[in-house]
Each structure stands twice: as C-alpha cells, then as structure tokens.
Amino acid sequence: MGDRGRSPSLRSPHGSPPTLSTLTLLLLLCGQAHSQCKILRCNAEYVSFTLSLRGGGSPDTPRGGGRGGPASGGLCRALRSYALCTRRTARTCRGDLAFHSAVHGIEDLMIQHNCSRQGPTASPPARGPALPGAGPAPLTPDPCDYEARFSRLHGRTPGFLHCASFGDPHVRSFHNHFHTCRVQGAWPLLDNDFLFVQATSSPVASGANATTIRKITIIFKNMQECIDQKVYQAEVDNLPAAFEDGSVNGGDRPGGSSLSIQTANLGSHVEIRAAYIGTTIIVRQTAGQLSFSIRVAEDVARAFSAEQDLQLCVGGCPPSQRLSRSERNRRGAIAIDTARRLCKEGLPVEDAYFQSCVFDVSVSGDPNFTVAAQSALDDARVFLTDLENLHLFPVDAGPPLSPATCLVRLLSVLFVLWFCIQ
C-alpha cells in the first residue's frame, strides 16, 4: 500500500518550537478507544508531563536524550514513557485509530527531536490548580473528524487511496493496478477493521465470461463515540438513499453526523461520507449494473490482518480470475470498431478506462456501458491526490485492436524489415 511518509517538522500555531501542548491535548481527546484499550490513559499521562514543558521546562529538567536543551531532554523522557505505555496496551488496541495515530506520532516526534529509544523515562507530575491568567486550553478538533485530527498530529494532510469497480467488473486497486475480472458471486472489495465492502457479480448473459456487479453491501463498523454499526445495501433497480435501518447518519452518538448518506440523483447515484475515517464512497447504477468508487485514508485502508488479505481493492483480482487480453478481444454483440467509436466520444484518451469501455460495450451490446467508464474516470479525477496516475495503461490491457489497426501495424513491421535488409 506504499510506505508511510515522514511528517514534516511540527510547529505550534504561533511558529514557536514544538512544545506539543496543542498536539498532546488533541491526543487526550481522541475518543474512539475501545473499552479495553488504555490509550486514553497513555495520552493523559503524556499530556500531564508535557504541560510542564510549555514554558521551556524547570531549571533542573535533565538534559540528554535530545537536542535543544532541558526542555528537549524532558520531552524525550516523556516520549519514551509514552512509547512504553502504548506498547503495554498494544494487544487490546488493535484497529483503534487513536492508538495507531499515537504510535506513529511518537515515532515522528522522537526522530524530530533526536531522541534515543533507550534512556530514562518520566512519570507525569501531580496536577496542580489552574494558574491564573493561563487562558483557555487550545481548541481541539472533533474526535470524529479524521482529517482534522491527523493534520493537528502530523502537521500535514493525510494521504488517501482510491479504488473503483465498474462494468465487467473492472477493478482499479489502491496500487493503481487495473484488472478485468471474471469473478462471479460475492467478493470482498474491502475488509478491514473499520469498513467492509462486498460486491456480488453475475454473468452479463447466459454462458458469457463477462460479469457485472448486481449487488453491493457496505458495513461501517461500530466506533465508540462516533457511530453505531451501519449497513448499506444496493441492488440493481434498488439504490436506496438510506441505510438498512432507515437512517441517513451514524446514529445518536456524539459523532453520529460524521457518517452521512446523500443522493445526487435518486435511484442512480448515492454518496456516503464517513468523516470519522476520512472516507467517501460513491455507488452508481448505469445500464443495469452497479459501480463502486472510494477515497479512503491510508491508515484506514491499511488496518487489516493477514486473515483479511483477500480484498480486490488491495490486491486486485486473483490471477485465476483475470481475463486475458485474448479473451477480452473476442468478438462480442457489437463490432469492436463500433464500440471504439462509441467510447471515444466520452473517453478521448485510450487508457484503461477506454479499453474497459470498448470491452463492455462490445460484449454487452449496450452503448449505455460507456457511461459507467466515464463516471469511473470522473470519480478518479476527483478522488486521486496525484492526477499523474489518472490515466493507466496496463501492459496486458491494451485496447482491443480493430482489423484496420492490426493491418496498419503489420504493414509498419513489414516496412521496417524491408528497410533493414536493403
């Protein structure tokens, strides 16, 4: 899924050296810890100690273990204590976003302040009365707003990944792999600690290798303080604008509004936003089939175990379920030249989306399949953070060749051979 980038140097809102008061108070309020997970206790202990460093630390704060004098040395002691606390509670915090954010934040901060992993640790000082004139505590972002939490912790915007499935189905994975699949039945597009998405496919016609998505099931898993578990299910000719329980949000919890469902075009386009995990999903219906598109935070997409490794968005279609180029080039209900002309109108670049469109229109005989490929490309244009990856050109997914194209290429090869032997 790609390597996690290092956070840039963190600064306070006023540009002063990183005292971390703002960041640590953020961690204190990361409220979706599991009932057994003790990450909130670790956060509180760390906050308690680092608050004493806001003014640069006391004169007798130990040096060593970090650069920048006493305050930095004290900070390293606090970070080592924080890291030790997270290790002790790691077993019960699997899949908890507050825990994983804390672990990665500790690692980044120890690198920034040149803290050694071995060395003295600190115990949080006793809390004293509030100092007069200290002013209100810094504002903290909504614990159910993933992007705001991440930005405050890491000093940068989070990374996002994009996956889509449409048409035959064709799958664009998080790794920008593009496959045409023959999968039938129910297959998981996503299966991680926060989200489960399953697509059910059936043949476009009796005896055909090509299949289309007829049903999509999405489960937003329970997250304490943010949402109740919610299930969304769409089928061909039944694209509801609500979850299965009739609701349009995450429930009555404080962060219930961080999950919402909206419809741009009733019966054909539904958008689900899950701000608490930095995720947006679009489900569409075109030409008697469903399509799926997602933009998801990297940390969320990575939060799965070895037992959850079969995910089309992660690994693409299994090799045994991928249609070869020769299979994609077989004559369908519409001539390839005609399909190419129809697809070219909305997809001028002959990339993987264009190739998929030609295949779908040719096999199904339905020109409306052009809309599915065009919509998938439009979603990618919005969801991708790097538009250099918008157009994909898979090695084994070249556009179906028309007889005229084949003839031109053959003549070109013959001309080169003739020229070489002269």
Curated annotation (Swiss-Prot):
What processing steps or modifications follow its translation?
Autocatalytically cleaved at low pH; the two chains remain linked via two disulfide bonds. Also proteolytically processed by TMPRSS6, several fragments being released in the extracellular space; regulates HJV activity in BMP signaling and thefore iron homeostasis.
Chain positions listed as propeptide in the UniProt record: 397-422
Q: Where in the cell is it found?
A: Cell membrane
Record's bilayer topology term:
Lipid-anchor; GPI-anchor
Q: Where is the composition biased (Low complexity)?
A: 128-137
Quote a single Gene Ontology cellular component term: plasma membrane
Indicate whether DNA repair appears among the record's keywords.
Answer: no
Residue positions, PTM Phosphotyrosine: Y46
Q: Which cysteines are joined by disulfide bonds?
A: C144-C226, C163-C313
Q: Which superkingdom heads the taxonomic lineage of this protein's source?
A: Eukaryota
Specify the signal sequence span: 1-35
Show the segment(s) annotated as Disordered.
116-138
One record GO biological process: negative regulation of transcription by RNA polymerase II
Spell out the coiled coil positions from the record.
Answer: none
- Positions bearing carbohydrate: N114, N209, N368
Q: What Pfam families does this protein map onto?
A: RGM_C (PF06534), RGM_N (PF06535)
Question: What's an example of a GO molecular-function annotation for this chain?
Answer: transferrin receptor binding
Task: Quote the residue positions with lipidation, kind GPI-anchor amidated aspartate.
Answer: D396
InterPro entries found in the cross-reference section: RGM, RGM_C, RGM_N
Specify where it is mainly localized: membrane
**Which PANTHER family does this one have?**
HEMOJUVELIN (PTHR31428:SF3), RGM DOMAIN FAMILY MEMBER DRAG-1 (PTHR31428)
Oligomer status and interactors: Interacts with BMP2 and BMP4. Interacts with BMP6. Interacts with BMPR1B. Interacts with TMPRSS6.
- UniProt record similarity statement: Belongs to the repulsive guidance molecule (RGM) family.
Known role? Acts as a bone morphogenetic protein (BMP) coreceptor. Through enhancement of BMP signaling regulates hepcidin (HAMP) expression and regulates iron homeostasis.
Designated name of the protein: Hemojuvelin
Its gene is Hjv
